[in-house]
Design a protein with these regions (language model features):
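Structured adenosyl-cofactor binding patch, chiefly the S-adenosyl-L-methionine
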Residues: 195-237
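Fold-independent oxyanion-binding glycine-rich loops
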Residues: 10-11, 22-23, 44-45, 85-86, ...
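Structural motif
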Residues: 4-5, 38, 61-62, 78-81, ...
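Non-catalytic positions within long, well-ordered alpha-helices that form the structural scaffold/packing
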Residues: 29, 99-102, 202
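Active-site/ligand-binding-proximal alpha/beta "capping" segment
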Residues: 159-200, 206-211
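RNA substrate-binding interface of SAM-dependent RNA methyltransferases
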Residues: 72-165
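N-terminal positively charged helical leader segments and presequences
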Residues: 1-70
Length: 237
């Protein structure tokens, strides 16, 4: 049977027993796990601990750890998705899909046309839960680090190496191939970037890239850009 995946704060050592409570224990009960069932423990660092259930109660599940190893690494290098802040439910969808598509980081950006955005107190914990659940579903051993919202200028300054692309409908066609290494994708609000923002990005060494489509919602553009980036990195020159 497929191994259930449970999230822990820190991956336990081989031969140890790990007691899991709270939401992950509830997840184990929802999966109807029983003593002897195989499980995979992940902590978001790219490693996995394989083991089996040795006890299961109403409040906790205990796992005996049999092996720990690094999960298969992404062949292309880390992808950083920076997206102009949108409504929280749409951010949750972006976070979920970014995790499934292997983004290493997700940063919310406050642009000129998203100045009214204010992150609610519960937004960061909610996005953290979303990416953890998405990683379990996609069987990934890591998930994006969440940051922001940061100012547009700060987002530009934060990326100094690798390929840096800012999406713009009037920009150059999205690259068919990209060199291996870090890639940053800057996705704007539906109203688009201002001329001043585009000029600032170009002056900072970013390249424009177009998805060759009509006007897209921010979440659609984010997923399309991630998908094209993975394909372009697979065809790296």
């Amino acid at each position: 049977m497929p191994r259930a995946r449970l999230v822990v704060e820190t991956l336990p050592a081989i031969g140890s027993r790990c007691r899991i409570e709270g939401e992950e224990a509830a997840h184990a009960r929802a999966r109807r796990l029983a003593v002897g069932d195989p499980v995979v423990l992940v902590d978001g660092t790219g490693r996995e601990a394989h083991g089996s259930v040795v006890s299961l109660t109403r409040v906790a599940v205990e796992v005996a750890v049999e092996s720990v190893h690094a999960a298969a690494a992404e062949a292309h290098g880390p992808i950083h998705l920076l997206v102009a802040a949108v409504r929280s439910e749409r951010l949750s969808w972006i976070a979920e899909k970014a995790t499934e598509l292997g983004a290493a980081r997700l940063t919310l950006v406050a642009s000129q046309r998203t100045q009214r955005f204010r992150a609610s107190e519960g937004l960061a914990p909610r996005l953290e839960r979303v990416v953890r659940e998405a990683a379990k579903q996609a069987e990934r051993a890591s998930w994006p680090a969440i940051a922001g919202p940061v100012a547009f200028a700060e987002a530009l300054r934060g990326e100094t190496a690798g390929t840096r692309l800012i999406l713009d409908p009037s920009g150059e066609p999205f690259p068919a191939a990209l060199p291996a290494g870090a890639t940053a994708l800057l996705v704007g609000p539906e109203g688009g970037w201002t001329d001043a923002e585009l000029q600032a990005a170009l002056s900072a060494g970013w390249l424009t890239a177009s998805l060759a489509a009509g006007k897209l919602r921010a979440e659609t553009a984010a997923v399309a850009a991630l998908t094209l980036t993975r394909a372009a990195l697979a065809r790296r020159p």
